[in-house]
From Swiss-Prot:
One of its GO terms (molecular function) is rRNA binding. Part of the 50S ribosomal subunit; part of the 5S rRNA/L5/L18/L25 subcomplex. Contacts the 5S rRNA and the P site tRNA. Forms a bridge to the 30S subunit in the 70S ribosome. PANTHER family: 60S RIBOSOMAL PROTEIN L11-RELATED (PTHR11994). This is Large ribosomal subunit protein uL5. Keywords: Ribonucleoprotein, Ribosomal protein, RNA-binding, rRNA-binding, tRNA-binding. Belongs to the universal ribosomal protein uL5 family. It comes from Stenotrophomonas maltophilia (strain R551-3). This is one of the proteins that bind and probably mediate the attachment of the 5S RNA into the large ribosomal subunit, where it forms part of the central protuberance. In the 70S ribosome it contacts protein S13 of the 30S subunit (bridge B1b), connecting the 2 subunits; this bridge is implicated in subunit movement. Contacts the P site tRNA; the 5S rRNA and some of its associated proteins might help stabilize positioning of ribosome-bound tRNAs. GO terms for biological process: translation. Signal peptide: none annotated. GO terms for cellular component: ribonucleoprotein complex; ribosome.
Length: 180
């Protein structure tokens, strides 16, 4: 069972990028490797219920249970100790990755207030894209009335592209809404 975006990649994106960049082999075309979701919850150091709610939200959004991240060092100004749980993360690959990106591009990002597109400067120089979401309530899986607090998350999209231009062309071919 392939998702709609995965089928679109094979039928539309690969031929378009082969023509645009002059690739001779379809295996040269950049592809998506993984999508990593990270939610830092600093308040979890004092209240464990907050972390449980964050894990529940991320489970609904991603479709799989996230791993609880723990602090590596003690920081007195943040009032955290080494080994305390401070967030959660999950990595999506294959079908779940394509389904998540489909929901992100077509449903969630248009629900952001005053949305003008995502910044095209958020590439890391090696063909990977990072973005942040300020509210988890933009995802349709989250019930607005059941949310205890508004939390943001980081989304990292890892590709096999060698340059930022190739990665931007790949994401633009997926109809990713870039501002510039």
């Amino acid at each position: 069972m392939t998702s709609r975006l995965e089928k679109f990649y094979k039928e539309e994106v690969v031929p378009a990028l082969m023509k645009q960049f002059g690739y001779t082999n379809p295996m040269e075309v950049p592809k998506l490797v993984k999508v990593t979701l990270n939610m830092g919850v600093g308040e979890a150091a004092t209240n464990k219920k907050i972390l449980e709610n964050a894990v529940g939200d991320m489970t609904k959004i991603s479709g799989q249970k996230p791993v609880v991240t723990k602090s590596r060092i003690s920081v007195a100004s943040f009032k955290i100790r080494d080994g305390w749980p401070i967030g959660c993360k999950t990595t999506l690959r294959r079908h779940k990755m394509y389904e998540f990106l489909d929901r992100l591009i077509n449903i969630s990002l248009p629900r952001v207030r005053d949305f003008r597109g995502v910044s095209g400067r958020s590439f890391d120089g090696r063909g990977n894209f990072n973005m942040g979401v300020k509210e988890q309530i933009i995802f349709p899986e989250i019930d607005f009335d059941a949310v205890d607090a508004i939390r943001g998350m980081d989304i990292a999209i890892t590709t096999t592209a060698k340059t930022d231009a190739e990665a931007k062309a790949l994401l633009a071919a997926f109809k990713f809404p870039f501002r510039n």
